[in-house]
């Protein structure tokens, strides 16, 4: 018998299919002329002096006020206008769903972003009334230099933050969202490393200090963040800028951040270093604004809030709040719960423990051996 001359086409290997992202069931893309949109926005820096004005305060808009160095480790008093903060904003996108009772809904999905720091050329100013490069009255004014921190994020919900400080004895002003503000407890030495209870969401502009809060790598499933840090007291700022660089926001499964509630969340922090006053009379953080151009597309998703759950929530809220003995958790007083469904033949051993786990798999355990 002759062998066939043709070879069968190779079959591609199957890959995991993503069905859940950020608590939302992911379905197909929406096609059509109006299925893609672009959003342009910018975020101004929040370096401490966060509001424009006149006089001394207005002069340092985009800067911090002069940094005060404390005299001891345990007496570290921190003023709100001396710290750089994260900038953030929520952009309300066009509403996609008129009927929220359907099983499937449309959501905006962030696909890519073009972003750059604006105003880098302003750092060429060496003729201002600043600290001289040589002696007191000789040389040019020192340009902005020192520690730099650059970070931006695009997400479908507020950025998740993890708190960590250098000195837990620091006392932050009430206007600052500190670890104590979030947890309601005074900081301890555990806050100088990773404390899983010190978590927050970036929900306020110019209130979360960079020296306390950073993006939480264990969360942010529905956000994308990028950043870099360069330390040092005399480090020159190094920046690149172009309108041709596009950052893709899709993950390995081809899904980007899904904008819950038709909201797009932008976050940024761009610290360029310190501006030093004449004769080193004061040191000020200097920040610059960041520009965003975000491309979004529509995607079908499974309705995460079906009408039945909303009605059940409304029904349960009508009941009075009860404070009784624990029936859930580690101290639960429930001994056994049996749920029956359908019928089956009589089991040979009534003591066999049969159950279905959270993955829907059936398990059978033999009865425990009685104690002697």
Curated annotation (Swiss-Prot):
Q: Which residues carry this modification: Phosphothreonine?
A: 343
Its job:
Forms an icosahedral capsid with a T=7 symmetry and a 40 nm diameter. The capsid is composed of 72 pentamers linked to each other by disulfide bonds and associated with VP2 or VP3 proteins. Interacts with sialic acids on the cell surface to provide virion attachment to target cell. Once attached, the virion is internalized by endocytosis and traffics to the endoplasmic reticulum. Inside the endoplasmic reticulum, the protein folding machinery isomerizes VP1 interpentamer disulfide bonds, thereby triggering initial uncoating.
**Region labeled C-terminal arm — which residues?**
307-372
- Which UniProt keywords are listed? Capsid protein, Disulfide bond, Host nucleus, Host-virus interaction, Late protein, Phosphoprotein, T=7 icosahedral capsid protein, Viral attachment to host cell, Viral penetration into host cytoplasm, Virion, Virus endocytosis by host, Virus entry into host cell
GO terms under biological process: endocytosis involved in viral entry into host cell; virion attachment to host cell
The protein's location, in the record's own words, is: Virion; Host nucleus
Cited Pfam families? Polyoma_coat
| SUPFAM superfamilies per UniProt | Group I dsDNA viruses
The domain of life is Viruses
What is the protein named?
Major capsid protein VP1
Q: GO: which molecular function terms?
A: structural molecule activity
Coarse class of the primary localization is: virion
What does its UniProt record remark on the domains? The intrinsically disordered C-terminal arm interacts with neighboring pentamers. The unstructured nature of this region allows to make different interactions depending on the structural context: pentamers present at the 12 icosahedral fivefold axes bind five pentamers, whereas pentamers present at the 60 icosahedral six-fold axes interact with six pentamers.
Q: Which family does it belong to?
A: Belongs to the polyomaviruses coat protein VP1 family.
> So where does this one cross the membrane?
none
Q: How does it assemble?
A: Homomultimer; disulfide-linked. The virus capsid is composed of 72 icosahedral units, each one composed of five disulfide-linked copies of VP1. Interacts with minor capsid proteins VP2 and VP3.
